[in-house]
């Protein structure tokens, strides 16, 4: 990425956060800054031995290549244990990237709305369950030598966001292979002093299209739905009768990114930033997320707006942590249109 434009783009991201906060947007863009903290307990999750870690570095591994994973962390994803320590910071959020290359596992995480991390792990466990620690990034906390963003060189003084990058060595080949081939069976978890059992967590997902130098991982960002509806129209159904089918989507994301179809019934989603940069999306894969929630998506992004701006480098989009938005069931009156509220996190990844 051009250095001058990279600085301009980061400025745009920060501006988007400030605008969203002023407008009362609770879930806005997660920017890339840096801060640290001290370790604490992680009781409340099954134990583990952080298999195979033999060394740690405060700098994320450079270069492309390897398997890149992403997670959008929310307090609502935490699973409490009866009698266990506090979990689930309802105000917290984080976006995390992980790269597995050889025996090196790199992490880049940015958080907001929650305290400084006291522990940072990858656990093995499905959504809704607690699992053992498999990779422990705790040794990187307080060693953030690779600061990213406008606050580079200013230590831990960033007030608009915090981030951490680094690399650990893992010698367990079976674990490394499982991370690469079945990432959704693992989750990222960030602990704080207030929530020692886990403040925010999110399942890992493979980044399939976008290619970027992992040192620039936190140039990617997360924007959550501030207000949105999945829009359905009653249409003839296969096998006879009528049923609701997708007509459109209408949503405003953090940073005031507008989300809709390029035209009703087109089936092609688009995201338009206030600066005129924009992308359309084509679904690569769908992951069910419960009967009451629309599926999570991996989408290939195609540029459709200005060549400079917030979305100008976006090559892939992950729709994660979906809540609601499912089409009404049963019969309906032909032509009827309904909007079903939904929530989701969108992770915009550069190519």
Question: Where in this protein do the model-derived segments appear?
Answer:
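Primary mode marks residue(s) on the alpha4-beta5-alpha5 output face of response regulator receiver
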Residues: 209-231, 238-351
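Metal-centered catalytic cores of metalloenzymes
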Residues: 2-120, 124-238, 342
């Amino acid at each position: 990425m051009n250095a001058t434009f990279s600085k301009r783009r980061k400025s745009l991201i920060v501006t988007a956060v400030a605008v969203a906060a002023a407008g009362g947007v609770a879930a806005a863009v997660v920017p890339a800054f840096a801060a640290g903290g001290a370790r604490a307990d992680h009781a409340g999750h099954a134990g583990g031995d952080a298999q195979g870690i033999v060394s740690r570095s405060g700098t994320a591994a450079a270069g492309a290549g390897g398997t890149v994973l992403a997670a959008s962390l929310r307090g609502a994803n935490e699973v409490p244990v009866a009698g266990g320590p506090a979990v689930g910071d309802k105000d917290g959020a984080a976006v995390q990237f992980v790269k597995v290359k050889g025996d090196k596992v790199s992490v880049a995480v940015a958080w907001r709305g929650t305290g400084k991390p006291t522990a940072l792990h990858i656990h093995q466990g499905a959504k809704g369950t607690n699992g053992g620690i498999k990779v422990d990034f705790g040794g990187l906390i307080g060693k953030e030598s690779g600061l990213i963003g406008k606050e580079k060189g200013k230590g831990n003084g960033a007030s608009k966001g915090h981030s951490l990058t680094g690399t650990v060595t893992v010698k367990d080949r079976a674990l490394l292979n499982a991370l690469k081939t079945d990432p959704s069976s693992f989750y990222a978890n960030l602990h704080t002093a207030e929530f020692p059992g886990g403040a925010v967590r999110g399942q890992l997902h493979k980044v399939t299209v976008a290619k970027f130098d992992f040192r620039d991982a936190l140039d990617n960002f997360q924007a959550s739905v501030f207000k949105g509806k999945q829009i359905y129209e009653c249409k003839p159904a296969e096998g006879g009768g009528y049923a609701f089918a997708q007509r459109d989507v209408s949503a405003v994301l953090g940073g005031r990114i507008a989300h809709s179809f390029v035209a009703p019934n087109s089936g092609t989603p688009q995201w338009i930033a206030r600066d005129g940069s924009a992308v359309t999306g084509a679904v690569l894969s769908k992951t069910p997320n419960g009967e009451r929630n629309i599926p999570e998506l991996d989408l290939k992004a195609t540029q459709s707006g200005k060549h400079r701006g917030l979305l100008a480098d976006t090559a892939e989009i992950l729709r994660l942590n979906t809540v609601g938005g499912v089409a009404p069931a049963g019969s309906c009156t032909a032509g009827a249109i309904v909007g079903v509220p939904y929530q989701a996190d969108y992770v915009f990844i550069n190519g």
